[in-house]
A protein has these predicted regions:
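Helix-turn-helix/winged-helix DNA-binding modules
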Residues: 25, 301, 379, 431-432, ...
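Eukaryotic partner-binding/assembly regions in large regulatory complexes
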Residues: 311-313, 377, 416, 476
Length: 702
């Protein structure tokens, strides 16, 4: 490696942390990971969303000689990260199908001439000999494999092209690799290591705990009404994501919210590419927008002020649930993860598993994922304890989730379980019939419905033996028996059948403890909205904070980027509290790197002094969107020019001065990778490229 010594590299990494990214110290294991990769070692990194994974490859790319090549699964993710890096003065570019031939050639030329610090590629590009030959001709500092869980063949985000990434070490054996993901069980972790052929990699596993997120799971009654109550009472005016299982549910829910005064937009793969891009852009740029989406939405979205993530349908796995809820509260502020869950969710998921492709082993694997999700829903433990245990980590009760705030009562459900299981047995043995939960509950409660009379079920000996429980309670019994593996669902109609474990309950050899739903679901300790003062902001600083937010909003609109690409709320809060009176003092604020200090420092000082700031960015950077987000280098470096090709470079030869660096205190990296402006090409159908396999649509309803 072209460096003087390991200590020099470490020193330079700290300088990069501060000068480029505006942080004073690394967080958690960031420094250890960065030092290891700078030294040429392979690494597998498991770190939660908002934990600063991106810094772990961005800083080594700026310190090591050559260009860091980042393998990213989504085109939108590449665009977002590149745009935000340009704003920091990092020379970043990408190659994907949104570019025409001339644009691609420009980026390729910059790569070969060493005018890039980072190059983003989709994994599909590495199946193309032309791309491989390009990489052979350049100097590569490292390979970063982002969203590495996509290599897990039976995972929730599997991408087949990730399987081919094992060839990186074969073709470039001396180039270090770092694989990163925000969610992985021990099994997925092992699969990542094996499939990417990284046997000698060091493994870094951070805590998956997200203490600022409150986890709440409610019994599904009228889910859209329940959601509306949550938004009105606790998240008025907040940005959030609502996940639904189907496209039809997405459309209906978005329409319902709009009709009730909520700014909501749909997002699913059934919408055309332009509409999806426009809706995503509005979510990123406008305050208080709610996106209602299938799980196709969210990977790579770095909007820090998402205050809630709601699920109106049961997620397929705990891993998927964790990843989706992790999109809330990236800024560290209190946020809500809310899920409405009902019996029909289980029926639907079982039906999907039965009809899924793959062998019996695959279906058993999907069933085990669903069973773990059901167990999380029905637990009487702290949600956080149960969630972290799934990932092999230990934690004490959080005191903040619904089960901690309103501990559910438990009761002995053995007798009701025996009654329900006996009813199923009698229907099968005496009548040769199978029915779903609704009919079983009607029989138990002694309800002479038309269907009960039609099948003569009122003559069964078990008819009416469960009159002591209401229908909702019987549905709760069914849900919990399913979660405990004492009951199963089969077929298109969701009929209930016994399992091997059911016999022990019927014989009286096993007790069945159950949770009783609280009369009223617990709320957050204090309702939050974007209009409320942030929890860590002194009251006297609030007017200054709002003035800074207003300036940031105007500046972002002028430049055509999301507000948090200018500065995150956390940085504005620190500025409002510290009230710096000079650019030197402003430069010590977390999140204010040299490039942003040069561009925005005088304007911020004007706002703090109560003066009207001059329009546009300073230090020679134009205020129009074409050039605003693209300045490269330090305050003394020439302004950069951003091209539609997906790269930004300075006029100075060789490495950008960003490599001299600048990163630190709580270096989550969130401030570095906000989603940036969407290039015009991202809104259009990409041209066919000869010899290049199509990149998968970002928005598949998995």
């Amino acid at each position: 490696m072209d460096v003087d010594s390991a200590s020099d590299d470490v020193s330079e990494a700290v300088q990069v942390l501060r000068r480029v990214f505006g942080y004073d110290a690394f967080r958690g294991s960031q420094q250890e990971i960065i030092e290891h990769v700078i030294g040429g070692g392979d690494a597998v990194v498991l770190m939660p969303t908002g934990g600063g994974k991106s810094l772990c490859y961005q800083i080594p790319s700026l310190v090591r000689s050559g260009v860091g090549v980042v393998i990213s699964p989504l085109i939108a993710l590449m665009q977002d990260q590149v745009d935000a890096l340009r704003a920091l003065g990092v020379r970043a570019g990408f190659l994907n199908s949104t570019q025409d031939l001339e644009e691609r050639r420009l980026v390729e030329a910059e790569f070969l001439s060493g005018e890039l610090d980072l190059l983003y590629l989709a994994p599909e590009r590495l199946r193309v000999e032309q791309t491989l030959n390009l990489l052979d001709r350049g100097k590569i500092s490292l390979f970063a494999i982002d969203e590495a869980h996509c290599v897990a063949q039976w995972g929730h985000d599997f991408r087949p092209d990730y399987l081919a990434l094992s060839m990186l070490h074969e073709r470039w054996p001396d180039v270090p690799r770092i694989a990163l993901t925000a969610t992985a069980t021990d099994a997925t972790h092992t699969e990542i290591t094996s499939r990417l052929r990284m046997p000698d990699a060091r493994h870094f596993v951070a805590s998956f705990d997200r203490p600022n997120i409150q986890y709440r799971i409610a019994a599904k009654n009228e889910p859209k009404r329940q959601l509306l109550e949550l938004l009105r009472s606790e998240h008025a005016g907040d940005a959030g994501i609502v996940y639904c299982l189907s496209r039809a549910s997405v459309e209906k829910t978005a329409q319902f919210l709009v009709q009730n005064g909520i700014d909501a937009l749909p997002y699913h793969a059934g919408l055309d590419a332009r509409t999806r891009a426009e809706n995503q852009s509005r979510f990123l740029r406008e305050d208080g927008m709610v996106v209602v989406a299938t799980i196709a939405f969210g990977m790579g979205i770095d909007k820090p002020d998402v205050r809630f993530v709601a699920h109106l349908d049961l997620p397929k796995s705990v891993e998927g649930y964790y990843q989706e809820t992790g999109r809330a509260g990236r800024d560290g502020q209190p946020s809500t993860a809310w899920l409405a869950y009902g019996l029909q969710d289980v029926v639907q998921q079982r039906k999907m598993i039965d009809g899924s492709e793959g062998d019996d082993a695959h279906r058993r694997r999907l069933s085990s994922h669903l069973d773990a999700m059901l167990a999380l829903c029905e637990t009487v433990q702290c949600r956080r304890v149960r969630l972290l245990a799934y990932f092999g980590q230990q934690s004490g009760p959080c005191g903040n989730c619904d089960t901690c705030l309103a501990p559910p009562q438990t009761w002995d459900g053995t007798v009701p379980a025996q009654k329900l299981l006996s009813t199923i047995v009698r229907l099968q043995r005496e009548r040769g019939q199978k029915f779903g939960a609704g009919q079983i509950a009607d029989i138990l409660m002694g309800k002479k419905t038309a269907k009960v009379i039609q099948f003569d079920h009122d003559s069964l000996s078990v008819f009416g033996i469960g009159e002591d429980l209401r229908e909702a309670e019987w549905r709760g019994v069914v849900r919990q028996l399913l979660a405990q593996g004492l009951l199963a669902v089969e077929g298109d109609y969701g009929t209930l059948v016994l399992t091997e474990a059911s016999a022990e309950v019927l014989r009286g050899g096993r007790e069945v403890p159950m949770r009783r739903e609280p009369e009223k679901a617990p709320r957050a300790a204090k309702a939050k909205s974007r209009r409320a003062a942030p929890v860590d902001l002194p009251e006297e600083a609030l007017p200054v904070f709002e003035s800074l937010r207003a300036w940031r909003g105007r500046t972002a609109k002028e430049q055509g980027v999301p507000a948090y690409v200018i500065f995150h709320d956390a940085t504005l809060r620190e500025i409002a509290t510290a009230r710096p009176s000079s650019t030197a003092e402003l430069g010590t604020v977390t999140g204010v790197g040299e490039n942003k200090l040069a561009k925005y420092g005088p304007q911020i000082l004007d706002v703090l002094a109560g003066r009207e700031p001059d329009g546009g960015a300073t230090d020679g950077t134009a205020s129009d969107p074409a050039s605003a987000g693209s300045a490269a280098g330090s305050a003394s470096a020439p302004a950069a020019s951003a091209s539609a090709s997906g790269s930004a470079s300075t006029s100075a030869p060789g490495r950008s001065s960003a490599r001299a660096g600048r990163p630190g205190t709580g270096a989550s990296g969130a401030g570095a990778f906000g989603a940036g402006a969407f290039g015009a090409g991202a809104l259009e159908e990409p041209p066919e490229e000869e010899g290049v396999p199509p990149e998968p649509e970002d928005d598949i309803d998995w």
